[in-house]
């Protein structure tokens, strides 16, 4: 049993033997056990004498990066590809889950365009005998390091299909991994393939200049796309006030209307001309039609452009990446491993404890009051406070005086909620040309006659997510508000609805479905509309509390990837070690100009 699970069963506090914890030791109360909260906890234990106490409202570790288990199968919420331009994040991951030289897809030759980074991976050797009393699966692999090249972007793709570019240092780095490998605690190297499903046809994602694309679009539409793009380059919309302006400037009006407008509005439930252009800066950044065409030409005509051992990382937009790292049993495996380490090193993790009140004395937070599933209340005092809870809830929980304008901004923040329906099938109706399973990790469904937004094929993320390799395990993704009829629909009705939709567009035959499972995830995506244009009023107020640090996606109301969320936590710990936390630098993560623009 994972160590943190013991806390779910009722253990209130866990103090590791030999850690020397005392009643005088400083404490950090961390609200939330997602990537940001868990990173903060482990960093504090590794680098300071501060004891982390994590309070998680749910019964699961990992936040939206958790892995759902259902009858031996596993589901990844939204899909989490492990890359990072941050050397620090990459090393952090590698220390915990080194690449598996034995696993399926562990190809040492990983090619992208741009600069490369080398990662030391243990050489292949025979397994040592299992340790006595640990069972047949406890054998460890021990080996000296071997060098392979691996991409190190990070992408936690959002529902829009776009992804972040995060550049935290430009130096080529050799990442070291431990010499002892648990055969299950590893990263696989997986091929990435994503496509758009539109007009009941598959298009490359991102759109590429290929014969298939031209055939699918038809001559007339292709000409309109080209002319429209040229017009957009000649006459740019300035200033870019909305997401619509942002997309037209980069893709042209015709391509925007064909591939972006209806799908984006399906995802967000809001017209593109009412969504802040900052959303595009966060999620699309360096990608444009020009970028996609250049990438295609390099792959097609430049020697070594495809199949080379070079790794495309800091010079390639993450939407163009072709291989990625992935924990053997899904992203939640890594975060559960981190939770075990936190508890083992003397930290505490309290599951199903929701923070409802934050006690303040002036501009200093002194304690939080939380309630568990049985209604029991407890006060947790601390010296430092990390919050990953939604900012709307944070402001409501503060017992300090809150200005009316700040309450107004917080109350007006909006979130998009998420539903995924897992379907276990005998087969898919659509297949590769050779009759094999589609190789896509996910498919963006842009058909306007269904609500379905995206489809994952979990088999292609990791074969270990599927209990029966002869079956196909897919996830149908829906984006809604918690006030929508779709969100309120009973599970069985929602299963029938989802099956009917994916059958309607020709992906499966309804009779091939063996089983289904529904997962609802509230406040998955912080929105860039509502009162967001006044967000600075809110952030200035929360920053005024000297020992309160907002980190993570919902904690900062920023559409961050998991590596950016981790970096916010690391930056706070850096500041605590240095004696001063620069809160402005926290808001700068994933928003610097370098992230927003293509490199010239």
Over which residues does each language-model region extend?
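Conserved flavin/dinucleotide-binding core of flavoenzymes
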Residues: 4, 8-14, 67, 137, ...
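N-terminal Rossmann-like FAD-binding beta1-loop-alpha1 element of flavoenzymes
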Residues: 26-54
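Hydrophobic anchor at the start of a short beta-strand
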Residues: 28, 51-52, 385, 513-516
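Conserved Rossmann-like nucleotide-cofactor binding loop
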Residues: 36, 60, 392
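Glycine-rich FAD pyrophosphate-binding loop
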Residues: 45-70
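Mid-domain catalytic core of redox enzymes
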Residues: 47, 327-328, 351-506, 534-535, ...
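Dinucleotide-binding Rossmann-like beta1-alpha1 core, especially the glycine-rich loop
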Residues: 71-233, 285, 289
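Active-site/ligand-binding neighborhood in enzyme catalytic cores
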Residues: 190, 201-206, 210-361, 366, ...
């Amino acid at each position: 049993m994972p160590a943190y699970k013991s806390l779910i069963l009722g253990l209130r506090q866990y103090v590791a033997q030999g850690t020397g914890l005392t009643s005088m030791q400083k404490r950090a109360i961390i609200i939330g056990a997602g990537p940001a909260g868990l990173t903060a906890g482990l960093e504090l234990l590794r680098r300071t004498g501060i004891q982390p106490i994590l309070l998680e409202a749910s019964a699961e570790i990992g936040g939206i990066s958790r892995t759902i288990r259902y009858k031996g199968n596993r589901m990844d919420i939204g899909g989490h590809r492990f890359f990072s331009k941050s050397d620090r994040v990459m090393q952090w991951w590698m220390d915990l889950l080194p690449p598996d030289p034995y696993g399926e897809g562990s190809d040492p030759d990983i090619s992208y365009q741009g600069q490369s980074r080398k990662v030391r991976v243990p050489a292949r050797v025979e397994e040592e005998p299992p340790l006595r009393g640990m069972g047949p699966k406890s054998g460890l692999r021990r080996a000296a390091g071997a060098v392979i090249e691996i991409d190190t972007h990070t992408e936690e793709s959002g529902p829009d299909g776009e992804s972040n570019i995060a550049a935290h240092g430009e130096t080529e780095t050799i990442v070291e991994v431990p010499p002892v490998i648990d055969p299950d605690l590893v990263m696989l190297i997986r091929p990435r393939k994503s496509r758009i499903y539109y007009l009941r046809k598959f298009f490359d994602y991102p759109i590429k200049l290929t014969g298939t694309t031209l055939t699918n679009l038809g001559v007339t539409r292709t000409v309109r796309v080209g002319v429209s793009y040229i017009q957009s380059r000649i006459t740019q919309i300035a200033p870019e006030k909305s997401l619509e302006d942002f997309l037209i400037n980069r893709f042209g009006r015709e391509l925007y209307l064909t591939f972006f407008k209806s799908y984006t509005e399906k995802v967000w439930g809001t017209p593109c001309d009412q969504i802040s252009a900052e959303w595009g800066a966060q999620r699309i950044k360096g990608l444009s039609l020009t970028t996609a065409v250049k990438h295609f030409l390099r792959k097609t005509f430049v020697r070594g452009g495809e199949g080379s051992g070079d790794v495309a990382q800091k010079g390639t937009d993450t939407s163009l990446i072709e291989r990625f790292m992935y924990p053997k049993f899904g992203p939640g495996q890594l975060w559960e491993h981190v939770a075990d380490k936190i508890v083992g090193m003397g930290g505490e993790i309290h599951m199903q404890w929701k923070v409802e009140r934050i006690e303040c004395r002036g501009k200093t937070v002194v304690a939080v009051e939380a309630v568990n599933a049985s209604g029991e209340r407890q006060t947790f005092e601390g010296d430092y406070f990390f919050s990953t809870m939604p900012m709307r809830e944070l402001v409501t929980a503060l017992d300090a005086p809150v200005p009316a304008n700040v309450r107004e901004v917080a109350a007006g923040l909006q979130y998009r909620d998420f539903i995924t329906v897992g379907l276990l099938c005998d087969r898919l109706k659509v297949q590769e040309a050779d009759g094999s399973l589609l190789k896509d990790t996910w498919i963006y469904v842009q058909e306007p006659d269904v609500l379905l937004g995206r489809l994952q094929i979990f088999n292609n993320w990791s074969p270990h997510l599927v209990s029966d390799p002869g079956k196909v395990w897919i996830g149908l993704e829906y984006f809604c508000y918690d006030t929508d009829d779709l969100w309120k629909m009973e599970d069985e009705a929602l299963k029938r609805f989802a099956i009917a939709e994916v059958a309607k567009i020709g992906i499966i035959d309804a009779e091939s479905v063996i089983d289904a499972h529904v997962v609802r995830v509230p406040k998955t995506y912080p929105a860039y509309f509502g009162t967001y244009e006044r967000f600075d009023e809110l952030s200035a107020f929360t920053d005024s509390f000297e020992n309160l640090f907002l980190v993570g996606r919902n904690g900062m109301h920023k559409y961050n990837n998991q590596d950016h969320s981790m970096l916010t936590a690391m930056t706070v710990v850096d500041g605590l070690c240095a004696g001063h936390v620069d809160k402005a630098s926290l808001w700068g993560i994933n928003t610097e100009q370098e992230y927003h623009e293509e490199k010239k």
